[in-house]
Amino acid sequence: MRYLPLTEADRRAMLDVIGAKSVDDLFRDVPPSARLAGPLPLPSHQGEMEVERAFTRMAGKNLSAGCAPFFIGAGVYRHHVPAAVDQLLLRGEFLTAYTPYQPEVSQGTLQMLFEFQSQVATITGMDVANASMYDGATACAEAAIMACRITKRNRVIVSGGVHPHYAETLETSLRFTEMEADVLPPDPLGMEDMIGRVDSKTACVVVQNPGFFGTVRDLRPLAALCHEAGALLVVMVAEPTSLGLIESPGAMGADIVVCEGQSLGMGLNFGGPGLGLFATRDKYVRQMPGRLVGQTADVDGRRGWVLTLSTREQHIRREKATSNICTNSGLCALAFSIHLTMLGGTGFGRLAELNHLAATRLEQKLRAVKGLRVLPQSYYNEFAVHLGDDADAAAVVDALADKGILAGVPASRFYPTWPELKPVLILAATETNTEDDMDRLVAGLQEVL
């Protein structure tokens, strides 16, 4: 296929249609400081060996998660991923992100997605799940939009315990619609009260459990409050391994459950890729976005799998589709499914226990640090700590990084305009953390505080 570039007349005609004066107008939302004004300053051409050495030197400046005590979480978590997961992903029949439109030649992929859906529905306590979304943030936004369609209301209340990136993505998705997001202030103590906020105009309440600051809460009272007002409860789960220990959102009354699936099957990859999980009640299935794989039988009575309820989707009814998300995170869904299958039900529960035990052990050790206090009263594998009124959590993190310790995420990174959160540090502990890791963190905190 030949590449035919646009002429200046072509560009001018396209810009006129959208009302832009120049190509630069298309990038006006990008801050000038982030734009490249001239050619990229690359060195002269080099051989493969020289380039490899240069990149190796650059990589040597990084402090790898596997080479240091690692307590960073805040939405992405370090877990052990069995080597078999990546090996199975490399099989030719799976190594694609393409949607299997032709069931007669895609039974393996369709069966995998069907089993993935079944696993997601089981761990979330819901009736039905789709074949994945892009990531947890987009799944959260799509859930809010779905709730507005179902209730025919426009107001979305977002708990202060929801990850700020999820809240920002939700706000972006609603910005040019009639829907509005009411994002509550950050809630490090898990004490916010929804009474008086949920009313007849509320489409849904979006809450994260465990929360961004680590709080685990009983969602039943909130579910009852929402349902009494005719609103839906959307539950976001950023750490899906918690579902092996905490009662499922479905059992606590959630109407829609969305998750970030990165913890199972995927490692830490500079922020991606992620995996969005999306589950709901049977009665809302026709309003659910994303692909849906169903089980059927062919003319000979043999069991098979097909894409079902496809009239909800943009490739069938573009202008009336529930979402524009289509081909998305199928390979990541397979990684999630393989990892969860290898664990099994008992192993999944045991993994969750190990994570909670690691966090509990870390909390006990942190009691030796003068002036430090743990904020959540209940948590899973992550909690926020207050380092003292005069402490700067960001400076503490930098000081410990210089000592070879990756000591969590300062809350001020996400809330720079909230001075009361400057001393707050978010720490995560998983099955990968050792006693020595925890002792080094405690010793480091005692030294720098």
Swiss-Prot record:
It holds the Pfam family GDC-P. GO terms for biological process: glycine decarboxylation via glycine cleavage system; nucleoside metabolic process. This is Probable glycine dehydrogenase (decarboxylating) subunit 1. Belongs to the GcvP family. N-terminal subunit subfamily. One of its GO terms (molecular function) is glycine dehydrogenase (decarboxylating) activity. HAMAP family: GcvPA. Its EC number is 1.4.4.2. The glycine cleavage system is composed of four proteins: P, T, L and H. In this organism, the P 'protein' is a heterodimer of two subunits. It is an enzyme of class 1 (oxidoreductase). The gene is gcvPA. Keywords: Oxidoreductase.
